[in-house]
Amino acid sequence: MRRKVALAFIGLFTLILISRSVSAEVDGDRLVREAVEYYRGLASISVVEMVIHRPTWERKMVIKAWTRGVSDSLFVIVAPRKDFGNGTLKKGREMWTYNPKINRVIKIPPSMMAQSWMGSDFSNNDLAKSDSILTDYVHRVVATEEHEGKKVYVVESIPKPEAPVVWGKQILKIREDAILLVEEFYDEDMKVVKRLSGYDIQMMGGKLFPKRWKMEKIGREGEYTLLEYKRLEFLDDLPEWIFTLQFLRNPKRL
């Protein structure tokens, strides 16, 4: 009996040492930055189908998106026709939305960046996969896993003091080739609220990329949003005039 207890203690102690070793050897900040930069590339143009699913209804839309660096993004709905032209521009730490029916641009304050985008389970920050996760959080590797024969780093992301975020923490699972597999969002009581999962990894835009993404609400069965990339092109750069209010308002941009 004593021998079993001793072996169990040794095993637990070994796991603790391994965990500390992983945390010491791998820079969590670097991992997260590489994952965000891999996801967005230097610049990109994409067409994405979004499906908002609820227990009693489902809504579909098609979005065209432009991104540049880790902070500039433009998203415009191209279908269905009734929503055509609704857009969101994020440039640096500022964000605007445009409604063509009333021809009005509204500036979104940082405190509202976590609000739902077009009624989906994605927030404005989620959809843009913006630099908030880089600038507002401190990251550390807490464990490792395996996915399709590749090492996966489990990263705990804690908000910096006074950061304008609503989450108590985030947990990210990043594959060794910089592909983000999972992002979990925790409230201030450290209970997981929603989970983003990337899957169906295949060649897109010249590199391996999850073609499909699912954002689901924990504990609310049947409530989730799916994203499927229909087209994805990574570029070296995009012109400045794309990320302007004039382009956001201009229906000829598509």
Model-inferred region functions:
Residues I18-A24:
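Sec/Tat signal peptide C-region and signal peptidase I cleavage site
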Residues A24-A43, E49, E58-R59, G87, ...:
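Flexible, processing/modification-adjacent segments and terminal tails
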Residues A35, I63-T67, S197-M203:
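Extended lipid/amphipathic-ligand handling interfaces
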Residues I45-K82:
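N-terminal, post-signal-peptide region of Sec/Tat-exported proteins
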